[in-house]
Each structure stands twice: as structure tokens, then as C-alpha cells.
Amino acid sequence: MTKIDSKIPEGPVAEKWTNYKAHQKLVNPANKRRLDIIVVGTGLAGASAAASLGEMGFRVFNFCIQDSPRRAHSIAAQGGINAAKNYQNDGDSVYRLFYDTVKGGDYRAREANVYRLAEVSNSIIDQCVAQGVPFAREYGGLLDNRSFGGAQVSRTFYARGQTGQQLLLGAYSALSRQVNVGTVKLYTRYEMQDVVLVDGRARGIIAKNLVTGKLERFAAHAVVIATGGYGNAYFLSTNAMTCNCTAAVSCYRKGAWMANPAMVQIHPTCIPVHGDKQSKLTLMSESLRNDGRIWVPKKKEDAIKLQKGEIKGSDIPEEDRDYYLERRYPAFGNLVPRDVASRAAKERCDAGFGVNNTGLAVFLDFSEAISRLGIDIVLQRYGNLFDMYEEITDVNPGELAKEIAGVKYYNPMMIYPAIHYTMGGIWVDYELMTSIKGLFAIGECNFSDHGANRLGASALMQGLADGYFVLPYTIQNYLADQITVPRFSTDLPEFAAAEKAIQEKINWMMNIKGKKSVDSIHKELGHVMWEYVGMGRTAEGLKTGIAKLKEIRKTFEKDLFIPGDKEGMNVELDKAIRLYDFIIMGELVAYDALNRNESCGGHFREEYQTEEGEAKRDDENYFYVACWEYQGSDEKEPVLLKEPLVYEAIKVQTRNYKS
């Protein structure tokens, strides 16, 4: 079996990153100008990486699927970004953030990578403040913090409910400066279709101009993928509709391993599904769980009345409400990690206590917070989120609904779990390089930092850590040996072959000429993924799901209809290319979930749970990173490789959020 070298430095975990930086290879300024780097993606990870590499003097080509980097999905992040500043003097530290992240990930993350993430977190806040990011501040002017799930300290920095937007504007300003200087060339409305390998190394990409429809070749000494996750394989998710995994899957087909694809995060606080016409779901920030309390009725008859629309949540008095997270997990209450909160909501709804007409919703209530703090303070913290919820549902969570026996009850939100984030992704080593030399993956599209479950407010932290403070060091260790390599010509046969393969795939899709639209097949895919590869998984269900996924792939291959022409702009063609890769990724998620006969974090196999319904890990047999290797054809099952996990600073134990 292939032995996997993750290139983790020697020494204590707290010294690994410092020692690495002290001994890594460097590229001098004159040589940096001769080296080209392609960065695919302009979200927080991609924009920060492109800006940093350009500022260092490299020649950078940055690709953006949207009209502007400001439309990257990072802009949708609401609640905040974690850092171990300990401004609240509540016991936080780099080690505490490291420990909480490993524990939150159910001990399935690589220890050394997580410690580095916690270590550089403080620098991220300093960098963003210097860029002018308007983080919330206390009355005295100091940066404010709030709490997120899986932590007992307040370490989350935020800008109301638009933290991702403000951080992205900061990264975009840094990127724009380098575009103006000339070190970065920005390509908007381009989508990567394949990575080009020359002598086994990543030397460029084939990208589709989404305006003209033409395929174009781009060469570089190294390629960085920063294209996000694969949550849209489930069709309904909190991801933007353009989010896709085509770049990642193209790397997988060329030999990059896909790691832990079964680790998919389901966010507990999303607006429930309303009918079968929706194209996406809306997230309600985890920050709401700071002051919001999650509950269902204690009495099933009350739940039935709610489902029939005979009563409202505000009609149920305090003594008849079950604040089930506070009851089950007294130490963390409503701030348990996302996988725990999501499964608890599903369990209550499956037991018949759901509160809407589908029975698939629970309440998130702010009555106690408004009574304790006053409506003005609550609106200062969450007003924009309340407005968004009202815009979508026509219910104002800050509006007094009823007063019973002197107790004021406000309109509660209805929430239910939904697909949100993918902890799995392209395998990378400590240097963020994939199993293909010269190909790097950063941000959500890699697997490296979150194990089986990501803590809230840590996605923004990882994206900016990778782009600002990790990749600029590690990529030099690779490029230092490339300084004598001249710039590549896109006339090389490897580029021609890659472009030809993509063009043939496009021709094939356009010539299927079936009857089913891209969206209809995507909906079928999403239904199968949610039903069989969603929150509750079983061996039997996963086998059924794999069979159905293969049927969906056959339907695509025989009955897909794409209107229009392959020349020029064709949005349906672009969606079809992405959909086929979602199907391949969906199969990979199911294979990994079926192979992993344990429950951990976001991967919950119903056969493997405790008597209390908690995840039951199997550290003896599954204490590894699952790396899936492509076998040359979409028809062949991938081969599993294993990277054993090694923990030196943390004792592996069963997660406990009850005490």
C-alpha cells in the first residue's frame, strides 16, 4: 500500500510551524518575478493568497467564476471569525482554540495542521483590522467577541451579521492593489475545467471563458485551487448556486487524492424547506444561538396543533416548552457543536415534535434575551438577521406576540438543519500541497483542519490563515527548486491534449439531446443524497444510494437536454458540466460513508451510536484520513489509501458536551 508522507515537521506541536519557517527554502525577490502562480478562486482563501503572493513579487494569475471577486460565496458568511486573542480574559489561549477545534472535529483532524491554524489566528485579526475591517467594538472601543458552538469562551470577532462580506472586502482591497501594481492579473467569468500536468507536475489549467464559451490555456510554475466545497451535490444547501466542485474533481481525475469526502456538515439553524420549488436554502447565523433558545413542545398534542396551524409557538407557555439542548447538554446548552445540534433537532422531529406543517422544524426563541437585555440591545446584535428572516418568512422575531401570566412571548424563528459545509476535500500535506507536485489546495476545498465537524466561525479563519499566513511560506519551499525552470508554453502537447478532452466532453454533452433539464436531474441527485447520504446513514441506505447515483449518472448520459449551442455563452451547458462532477462527487461521498463503519462528527451511521443516541467512534479501525484515489475512469470504483493520524499533544477521548 502507498505510504503517505504528510511532511509534518519534527518536534513538539507548539514548535513545528516556527521550526518549519526557520528552515524552509526561500526564493529571492529577483527570482520571484520569474515565477508564475495560478490561483483559482477569489473567495477569502483565493483572494488573500493571490494578494499575498502578488505582494511578495510573484507573477499571479487569479481566476474568478463571477463578475467580481466580491461575489464569491465567502461574502455570505454571517456570524464571525475565531481567534485566540483572549480579549475577554475568559481563559482562552492558542492551545484552547487548538483543543476545541480537534475535539469539535471528533478527533479526525491532523493535529499539526490544527495547531498551526490556532497559532496564526491572532495575526488574522491584526491583518484585517489594518485593512479597515469594521469589527464590532465594545462601548470603550475594544474589539468585541461572542461565543459560537463547541466553545466555552468568547473568541469570535464579528461585524454584525456581515462578517464574511467585510472580510472579503478587505481581501478584495488587498487584491485590487496588486492588480493595479501589475503583479496580479485577474480573469473574471472564467471557470477552470482541468489541471494540466507536465512530467507529473501541475503546470497550468484549461479554463472556459463563460462569456465567449471558448476554452483557453494558461501555464504557470504552480497551481493553487481555492474553489470551496461540494455541498451543492445535495442540490438544496446554504451554498450559492454557482458553488461547484468541478475544479476539485478535475484535480481528482488527474491523481489528486480526495480525503474524507463523507465528512459533510449539516448546519442546525437554517430556514426550513418550503415546498419543492426552492433552488437553495438560507442560513441563519450560528451567532443567534448566543441568545436564542432552541425548543419544541413538551406535549405531542401541542406539536400536532402547531403542524395543523391551530396554534402558534407564542401560544405555548414556558412550562410546556422543552429546551432540549439545555436539558441534554447543560455545560454547553444551545452552543453545542453543529453536528450535535443538528442530530438533536432531527431526533425531536422524527419523534413527532416538529413545529411546522411538514413536521421538520424547531423553534429558535429570543423572548428570554429580549426580557433580560431589552429589545434595543438584541436588535443591535441581530437586527439585520431578524430583518432577513422577516423578509423571507414574513415573521418578525423581535415582535411581541403575546403576554401570558405576565410573561412576554415574542415570535420565535423556525429552523431546521441543512447542508452547509464540507470538511472533506482534496488531500493536502502540511505544506498544503496535494498528492500532485506543484498543485496546492487551500480553504474549504481541502480537508486539512476540521476533521469530522467544523466549529462555527472557523471557516473564515482557515481561509484567511491559508491565504495570508501559510501558503506564502510553504509554496516557496516548492518553488525554490523551480527557479531554473523557464516559463511554459501553452503549445505543449499536454495542454493540447487536456483542451481536446474537455472539448470532446462538451461535444458529447451537447449531443445527448434527451428530454431532461439539468435542474431536474440535479434535483433527483439532491433527493438521493439527502435521503441516503444525509444526516442519518445506514449501510443498507448507502448501498441503495450508490445504486441510485449510478442510475442518475446513466440518466444524465442518455437523457440530458441542453438548449442552445456550445459556442458563446450557455449557462445550461456550464451547469451541466458542474452537475456531472457533482454526481461523481456524490458517489465518492457515499463510498467513503459506507466504508467508515463508525459515527464521528458530521458522519453519523445509525448502526453506530450510544444508548443515548450520540456518535460512537471506532478509533481502533478508523483513526485515519481516508484518501480516495481515482482509477482512470468514472466507471471504476476508487481505491482507498490511509493516512494514519498521530496525536501527541491531545489525549483522544469520547466527546462530552454535557459536563
What does each model-found stretch correspond to?
Residues 124-214, 226, 270-284:
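Conserved redox-cofactor binding core of oxidoreductases
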Residues 67-99, 265-269, 276-280:
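Conserved N-terminal glycine-rich FAD pyrophosphate-binding loop of Rossmann-like flavoproteins
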Residues 15, 19, 24-27, 31-36, ...:
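Glycine- and aromatic-enriched mobile tails/lids
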Residues 41-43:
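Glycine-rich Rossmann-fold phosphate-binding loop(s) that bind the pyrophosphate
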Residues 33-35, 213-222, 435:
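Core beta-strand elements of the Rossmann-like FAD/NAD(P) dinucleotide-binding domain
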Residues 250, 257-402, 473-476:
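An anion/pyrophosphate-binding glycine-rich loop and adjacent beta-alpha core
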Residues 222-281, 450-473:
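Glycine-rich loop(s) and the adjacent beta-strand/alpha-helix scaffold that form part
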